[in-house]
Amino acid sequence: MDDDIAALVVDNGSGMCKAGFAGDDAPRAVFPSIVGRPRHQGVMVGMGQKDSYVGDEAQSKRGILTLKYPIEHGIVTNWDDMEKIWHHTFYNELRVAPEEHPVLLTEAPLNPKANREKMTQIMFETFNTPAMYVAIQAVLSLYASGRTTGIVMDSGDGVTHTVPIYEGYALPHAILRLDLAGRDLTDYLMKILTERGYSFTTTAEREIVRDIKEKLCYVALDFEQEMATAASSSSLEKSYELPDGQVITIGNERFRCPEALFQPSFLGMESCGIHETTFNSIMKCDVDIRKDLYANTVLSGGTTMYPGIADRMQKEITALAPSTMKIKIIAPPERKYSVWIGGSILASLSTFQEMWISKQEYDESGPSIVHRKCF
């Protein structure tokens, strides 16, 4: 499809917003889902001060701003700020007029009904889009992997969900949510690096720790054994150069940090780990479809990018499942953006074109139309 009429695909995550054009194989814009407002009026006199900043600009000016994340644990909690993020997406990042393009938005599994209505209302009334659609994030990830049945373990910055999907439909009664994701792991790494004598506290330093996490952390296949290896040799140590030129060395922190996904007790949480949550989701499904879920367990989201995570999931779920069960963990290399990619695929299918909610339908039925047309 041509850019001039291509649908826009916007995946709003707790940490990052991914946006682009349907039919593309990757999002054109990826920026932090943050809105910043000046802490003190008039502190930037003569700089053409704006009353708010979004994304990377808010991030770079964070010293003089109060930063807010309008999406918490995957769910929009601040609609005024969310509107600013969408405005920034259309006009500054994609440089398009939203009234000229259909818009596909994504939502968290189990998103409250009122929220989807509010999204619909803002798209039609504030941005005057000709058509829109709301799709569940995990379902799009499954489509991106070329499947319509499977269970998706989607873990991003703010929340982790396990979502069983059968023939393209998410099974709401079996979806489980775990409030443990990338942001918690970054915080945990800050904490364990502090125990090593390196101090990271400010939001600027948190970004450095996030980078260390993304570059050096991995999931151990056998945690106890890895701890023993780390204690007896320096083979697992890596060094990292901080922006000021100081070099720090990290050892067992590399795998202790993401281990919290499998042992939330590390963070003082009583929840089950991601392997057990996935298993529990499968067990909430009809016995006849479990086989299909075990054999199609798809990882999605930035927090599934750790090396070793798929092998560890395979090992842990094999230990929980019936002994004869075939278990397959699918970890596509592009899984950081698979929700967006699934949206790009869906919105460009010829069969999908009659699925859009049109402005006319919205005017006739109001925001509740979204429950009838998007599921």
Curated annotation (Swiss-Prot):
Residues bearing PTM N-acetylaspartate: 2
Phosphoprotein in keyword set: no
Modified residues (Tele-methylhistidine): 73
GO MF annotations, alphabetized: ATP binding; hydrolase activity
Domain of life the protein comes from: Eukaryota
SMART domains (alphabetical): ACTIN
Chief location bin: cytoplasm
Pfam families xref list: Actin
Processing and modification events after translation: ISGylated. Oxidation of Met-44 and Met-47 by MICALs (MICAL1, MICAL2 or MICAL3) to form methionine sulfoxide promotes actin filament depolymerization. MICAL1 and MICAL2 produce the (R)-S-oxide form. The (R)-S-oxide form is reverted by MSRB1 and MSRB2, which promote actin repolymerization.
Keywords: Acetylation, ATP-binding, Cytoplasm, Cytoskeleton, Hydrolase, Methylation, Nucleotide-binding, Nucleus, Oxidation, Ubl conjugation
Physiological role: Actin is a highly conserved protein that polymerizes to produce filaments that form cross-linked networks in the cytoplasm of cells. Actin exists in both monomeric (G-actin) and polymeric (F-actin) forms, both forms playing key functions, such as cell motility and contraction. In addition to their role in the cytoplasmic cytoskeleton, G- and F-actin also localize in the nucleus, and regulate gene transcription and motility and repair of damaged DNA.
Further comment: In vertebrates 3 main groups of actin isoforms, alpha, beta and gamma have been identified. The alpha actins are found in muscle tissues and are a major constituent of the contractile apparatus. The beta and gamma actins coexist in most cell types as components of the cytoskeleton and as mediators of internal cell motility.
Name under which the protein is recorded: Actin, cytoplasmic 1
Organism: Cricetulus griseus (Chinese hamster)
